[in-house]
């Protein structure tokens, strides 16, 4: 973080800084730490020794460019080389070689890694910090029971418990409790040592009886007793070295490893001075923990808050990558040992090159990035989505919580989150509170804690000094809130300010303040910081808004927001969507593909992104903003990216809105829009879809790419070139062939029916030796072919198939069924598109663009949209833009209202339009019905709001089925749009049909259109021949399936058709 000494303010750190710094930490420290743990290996006869010389490891720069790796589906990685030596002890001879260990995926400056052509990001995980935690619970008698929980570095738990008789018990992995003396003796302490190292020896001596004293009389007895309780082994086990090794491996090495952070926490909590390199639980730790537990029992000491951030740690990308690297080295060690044993057995002379293979490291990282829950595909819907994804944190994942077991207390916000975790930005649904976003200034410290910056206030310092504090440290300071930024020193000394102290919010004098916040946005995430007037919105609506901004689609013609918060430029810069000048110079050439910059005796060519597809099928494109001959400075923007205008984030459009009902078309959050938004390409966006096909070598021969496809109409093949691949620039419709492919198959005449063979003989048709397996354009994929990539397989590689990828661009205007949203949680679906002349219009004749339901505001309590649309109208008329910091009521009461109304009054005067600000109903205006020309009865709130089109579009969701595939078991239509499935008619839908009395429609839904096989066939035949469709006879397939399942339970269920005739016959027989 940089600091401006003149103004006392600081610039916002880069949003991808946490990810990139974590990866650099892994490269600088983590690699060397794990390589130093790699052991020296000997054969069984100790004639040969293998070791790695880790001081000379090196990473090689990748040979392929990052952009090429995307198109060829490769991993952008670096090769790791280490010096290895093989020593023969007989001749004291050593052979040293540089060996290839494997590939390590690299991270770019935006904090993302490219694996198999897909950008991925590693989410930070929050875990319980290793150490000891004390808590109190009530037993069934209402008596407090104090327990101390020891959490190991990998998450294992052991408990110490003191009962009402002051007896101390130990419980390992929630199993049966045993006396504290048993594990202490098993760890190597005798009874005399225990009594000499505790503060309350009389309590330790009070409860062991003769039988228990015998168990701890010697280490062997204590180990046997502890092993019997820990492993739940019955009988009388015998002490042996193998038993000790098993106990050492399964308990003391796994469940008692505290790690570097756990050792530090244990020393601080129990006032110990054990060296930091002692990362395992010691007898001294157990005895000190028991002493502290006794003090808790008698009212000394404080209990721990497990949800406080000081008791949490961040498992960052550095930790995860280091863990995977250590796992890969363990696998490599096993491979090397096996290879050495095999070479000795076959009397071969191995070399370091023969012993070391790159497979363990490469496959471990591929598995980690592809399968680990914390490794996620980078969300690139728009620039904001990308930077927010890099600052996410999660309680979920290996060693963490699950969405169904996490309690409300864990999900809730905590006072220690202030300035570290955003209280607004979190997921909706089952993961609410378990996945969130770091605050805008937060960073991850060396000990895995989340640190936040503050200004230290001291009389001895002439200027305020900025310090980063962990949650453990700032708990003991009085921290002033951000409102003190607006006060000069003279006013501050007389001021009483709100402050935070020991998880409480107080109001104290300025002289007692130790620290103050550095920025008004300090406690919000990037997404929440982009919402103007957020203080006037309900927190639930602010949460929805911060999530929906990440779903906004980049528009073909974006626009800066009139009302913003000032962070739009920072967000656009951190996203990496813009092209930035790396040094001063002069533009010597520019076009749509590249910009050439000359300066400092060097000329660099900056390639631009042209119609690149994101993983959400949105279009990423850069537009040059500088001309030839222009001089630029370092850091200046050369080209704007998608959803970026003038270096600022631009996710939507400023449009004229009105809050009024209109013939019921905007009820229940529906939105009425003008056709101007369609024909003027106001909300037009481009989407790029990727379709691919592979050619394999089958048992009958290789598949062929060709344009000569038999038995297909020429119309479907019109866009193919001579190679059988669709031509660039072609307009393709649903069902068109994109790539022609033939798969060889066996030609056997006996496989055809007799009449088929007769027809072939009469017509002279040859038996086909190939099957058509072309790539066809699916439903909803119509568009323009903008790129075709044919990825050839490498030489000498028969396993990797050739891949052909076709990229098709779609232009989508806004239409009925699309979802739009503002920045205050005000979302809705387009219900109707009205002609311009029918839309309500203002007193100057301007038609409104969107009509919202006013009933959506009082119940949702998102009043911020009212302030935004009113001041947006003033800004549009005055040609001004506003950047408003949230919580402006810190300066005075009704500050937002006092800002908006004078601007409206000023706009009314300058434009000579008195209707802009009418004192009787400020912010409202009388508007007219476009159909009749009559004014509406009541004045209506009008204004300019910033509205976004979201990724939830009707083109991706609308679906219809006339015929399709059926499930084999139930014979019902498949489910889902991707499988061309049908819509389920369930119980409630049947009830609705019964309520209307539509018997024939109900019968069709449950038989002909569903799972009555014979009725389906009869409908098809009757439709072709003509005539009346017969009624279905017999039971549908799902009922027959139920009968079969009941038969498997030895229950017989018979069914028969009851008609008027059969009913009369049965009646006579009775």
Curated annotation (Swiss-Prot):
It catalyses: RNA(n) + a ribonucleoside 5'-triphosphate = RNA(n+1) + diphosphate. It is found in: Plastid, Chloroplast. Its EC number is 2.7.7.6. It is an enzyme of class 2 (transferase). The keyword Membrane does not apply. Gene3D superfamilies: 2.40.50.100, 2.40.50.150, 3.90.1100.10, DNA-directed RNA polymerase, beta subunit, external 1 domain, DNA-directed RNA polymerase, subunit 2, domain 6, RNA polymerase alpha subunit dimerisation domain, RNA polymerase Rpb2, domain 2. In plastids the minimal PEP RNA polymerase catalytic core is composed of four subunits: alpha, beta, beta', and beta''. When a (nuclear-encoded) sigma factor is associated with the core the holoenzyme is formed, which can initiate transcription. Belongs to the RNA polymerase beta chain family. This is DNA-directed RNA polymerase subunit beta. It comes from Illicium oligandrum.
